[in-house]
Swiss-Prot record:
Disordered as annotated region, ranges: 194-215, 283-309
Record's comment on post-translational modification: Conjugated to ATG12; which is essential for autophagy.
Subunit structure: Conjugated to ATG12.
Swiss-Prot/TrEMBL GO biological process terms: autophagy of mitochondrion; cellular response to nitrogen starvation; piecemeal microautophagy of the nucleus; protein transport
Crosslink feature (Glycyl lysine isopeptide (Lys-Gly) (interchain with G-Cter in ATG12)) location: 138
Organism of this sequence: Oryza sativa subsp. indica (Rice)
Protein name: Autophagy protein 5
InterPro entries cross-referenced by the UniProt entry: Atg5, ATG5_HBR, Atg5_HR, ATG5_UblA, Atg5_UblA_dom_sf, ATG5_UblB
Family recorded in the similarity comment: Belongs to the ATG5 family.
Function: Required for autophagy. Conjugation to ATG12 is essential for plant nutrient recycling.
Bias (Polar residues): 194-203
One GO CC term, this protein: phagophore assembly site membrane
Length: 380
């Protein structure tokens, strides 16, 4: 039975390859304000890697539209139905979050001028995306092992090779380097070997998952509200602004409970989002904090993720629902998506964490909640 639980929670090479090979079909339109020729150019069709980022597609998109672009310095950004897209959120997460009913191809608009700096943080192309990725990896390492030294001590060559593997979707190259960071896989028996923890207390070596202390899984939650009486997700109103999306960083600590063979995704979500899983809240029907913020500045290769910075990161986990800007009254969970999959709530959570995480070691979960219409008060 124990071996069976290990299999249920363990890492799957096939699942990892499917995640790394996943892509969103994109149809990119050039905004009318950037068109300088007639007739206007046709849209550009491409595949956006789920684990990739929109700015990394700019070189091939610009090549397609180059003959019609206005002169001047490019300030490239993307929008979907009027919403500027956060460049540091993976393409797959943006798609799962903003397309309630999957749209194929996903129609995006690209702008080469008029960057909305009041909404989006600056992006200087690949370098900005790389620093954002490395910073997230350091944060994840701190959550998992208690410090970020394993990432900080990477050589420049290894950092470059790791980033190239992410950009090119090279899972084998990624695994060759990432396994040295000791950031996974998470194991069901990670709570039992306490003696090894005592032996490491005086050491600066990072603890790998399974070293005896509770596993801590880096999780990013994106909570979107839709109409509760929505019959078909294709009728969901589009997201008008990022303030309507609740973004929550809540590391999940795996604690074994007596009588529980493994922790399900439902159990994890009840812990991560108790405001939506109260005794009166509903499960996902069978039939069917604020906007995310980029780092204030791009960290350099020598920057560390300190306990103080991670205290800020983990503050969401201990904050009240009000502080997270999530109003739980009159809301029920309607849909949960991870890597484009509407996940069964009974699936082992550690299997999801091990196999559906992104290359920066965060598990991104999109949650749709139905909002009930408020009943008018008597006489009003």
């Amino acid at each position: 039975m124990a071996a069976q639980r290990d299999d249920e929670a363990g890492w799957s090479a096939e699942a990892a390859r499917r995640v790394w090979g996943g892509a969103v079909p994109l149809q990119v339109h050039l905004h009318d304000a950037d068109v300088t020729t007639l007739p206007p150019p046709p849209p550009f069709l491409t595949l956006g890697p789920r684990i990739g980022y929109l700015p990394l597609l700019v070189p091939i998109i610009k090549a397609h539209f180059s003959s019609t672009l206005p002169p001047g310095i490019d300030t490239v950004w993307f929008e979907y139905k009027g919403l500027p897209l956060k460049w540091y959120i993976p393409i797959g997460v943006l798609y799962d979050l903003l397309c309630a009913d999957p749209e194929r191809p996903w129609n995006l608009t690209v702008h080469f001028r008029g960057y909305p700096s009041e909404i989006l943080t600056p992006c200087d192309g690949e370098d900005s995306v790389k620093w954002s990725y490395m910073n997230s990896l350091k944060e994840a390492a701190f959550i998992i092992t208690g410090n970020s030294k394993n990432v900080m001590n990477m050589s420049q060559a290894d950092q470059g090779a790791l980033w190239q593997s992410v950009m090119k979707g090279n899972l084998d190259g990624y695994m060759n380097i990432s396994t040295r960071l000791k950031l996974g896989p998470f194991e069901e028996d990670c709570l039992v070997r306490t003696s090894s923890v005592e032996g490491q207390q005086g050491s600066d070596e990072p603890e790998s998952p399974g070293s005896g202390k509770p596993c801590r899984v880096p999780v990013r939650l994106y909570v979107r509200s839709v109409q509760e009486d929505l019959y078909d997700l294709e009728d969901a109103l589009p997201v008008g602004d990022w303030e309507s999306i609740s973004y929550i960083n809540r590391p999940f600590e795996v604690r074994r409970e007596e009588g529980r063979s493994y922790i399900t995704l439902e159990h994890a979500l009840k812990t991560l989002l108790p405001e939506f899983f109260s005794s009166k809240a509903s499960r996902i029907p069978d039939d069917s904090e604020t906007a995310p913020q980029a780092p204030d500045s791009a960290p350099n290769d020598d920057s560390d993720v300190t306990p103080r910075s991670c205290e800020k990161l983990e503050s969401s986990a201990s904050s009240s629902p009000q502080e997270a800007n999530v109003a739980n009254k009159g809301k029920i969970v309607k849909l949960v998506r991870v890597q484009g999959i509407e996940v069964d709530m009974d699936i082992p959570f550690l299997w999801v964490a091990n196999n559906l995480k992104n290359p920066e070691c965060y598990l991104h979960i999109c949650v749709y909640v139905g909002t009930r219409k408020r009943e008018p008060k008597d006489g009003r």
